[in-house]
């Protein structure tokens, strides 16, 4: 998946509210409700320490403050440490953090210091977006198209298979597609023989990966991928329910998974 930019995180609260409205239309629950029902957990005054990390490409502008806004949106008490890196971790623990959130170029993690549970953003994001898609109340079948089968897409596709969906998978990386077909038993999707789906799960860092030939009227596209998998024109033409938000849904999944 692509690294986020400060522009992706602008107006994060507005993006969360819009995503919440769409998730509620699609599933009957808001994001918190889906996470609570899926993980069987509820926040209870956990204090979250957000630690900026300077390694690799450095700190993404707005990232830590966006995490603070997201955690508070979902009912957690949170703070951003003054210091980054190891000093920030020490500061977070000394100031009573029960959960640590921190990220470098490769890993975004949540660690519950009380119970020892730890979560990685990539599988948590794939799984929760797949879970939301699986709950689409207007789905006309158990067939799902999964586009992108990497570190986010594979866990999502596996989750859908485990829930009993018939998953048709596509990835531009043929070796990755073949491995997923072998590991999960999904059906490889052939673009030259298109069919339409009411549920589409997309997890790539590329734009316009969902062609018109696979879109059905009022389908749901659940995608953590940035940029957007579908054009605005196609979204409006087919009345697509688009679930797409840069950071909050995946973060909520991480937090609920470690409570």
Swiss-Prot record:
Record keyword NAD present: yes
A GO BP entry: pyrrolysine biosynthetic process
Top-rank taxon, per record: Archaea
Protein residues bound to L-pyrrolysine: 4, 53, 60, 103
Reactions catalysed, as given in the entry: (3R)-3-methyl-D-ornithyl-N(6)-L-lysine + NAD(+) = L-pyrrolysine + NH4(+) + NADH + 2 H(+)
Protein name, as recorded: Pyrrolysine synthase
Keywords for this protein: Amino-acid biosynthesis, NAD, Oxidoreductase
Disruption phenotype: Cells lacking this gene are unable to translate UAG as pyrrolysine, and do not produce pyrrolysine.
Upper classification of the organism: Archaea, Methanobacteriati, Methanobacteriota, Stenosarchaea group, Methanomicrobia
EC annotation from Swiss-Prot or TrEMBL: 1.4.1.-
Coiled-coil spans in chain: none
Chain sites annotated for binding NAD(+): 151-152, 171, 206, 224, 226, 245
Gene name as annotated: pylD
GO MF term set: oxidoreductase activity
InterPro entries named among the record's database cross-references: PylD_N, Pyrrolys_PylD
Pathway recorded for this protein: Amino-acid biosynthesis; L-pyrrolysine biosynthesis
Gene3D superfamilies found in the cross-reference section: 3.40.50.12150, NAD(P)-binding Rossmann-like Domain
SUPFAM superfamilies (alphabetical): MurCD N-terminal domain
Similarity comment text for this entry: Belongs to the PylD family.
Function: Catalyzes the ultimate step of the pyrrolysine biosynthesis pathway by converting the isopeptide (3R)-3-methyl-D-ornithyl-N(6)-L-lysine to the 22nd proteinogenic amino acid.
């Amino acid at each position: 998946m692509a690294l986020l930019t400060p522009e992706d995180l602008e107006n994060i609260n507005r993006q969360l509210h819009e995503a919440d409205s769409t998730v509620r239309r699609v599933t009957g629950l808001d994001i918190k409700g889906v996470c609570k029902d899926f993980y069987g957990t509820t926040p209870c005054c956990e204090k979250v320490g957000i630690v900026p990390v300077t390694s690799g490409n450095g700190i993404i502008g707005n990232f830590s403050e966006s995490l603070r806004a997201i955690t508070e949106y979902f009912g957690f008490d949170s703070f951003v440490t003054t210091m980054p890196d190891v000093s920030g971790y020490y500061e977070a623990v000394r100031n009573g953090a029960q959960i640590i959130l921190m990220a470098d170029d490769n890993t975004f993690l949540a660690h519950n210091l009380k119970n020892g549970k730890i979560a990685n953003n990539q599988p948590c994001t794939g799984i929760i977006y797949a879970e939301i898609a699986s709950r689409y109340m207007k789905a006309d079948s158990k067939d799902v198209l999964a586009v992108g089968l990497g570190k986010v897409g594979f866990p999502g596709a596996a989750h859908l298979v485990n829930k009993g969906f018939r998953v048709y998978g596509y990835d531009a990386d043929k070796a990755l597609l073949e491995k997923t077909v072998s590991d999960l038993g999904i059906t490889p999707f052939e673009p030259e023989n298109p069919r339409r789906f009411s549920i589409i799960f997309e997890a790539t860092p590329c734009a316009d990966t969902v062609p018109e030939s696979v879109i059905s009227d009022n389908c749901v596209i659940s995608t953590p991928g940035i940029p957007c998998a579908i054009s605005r024109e196609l979204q409006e033409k087919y009345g697509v329910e688009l679930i797409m938000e840069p950071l909050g849904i995946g973060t909520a999944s991480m937090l609920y998974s470690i409570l």
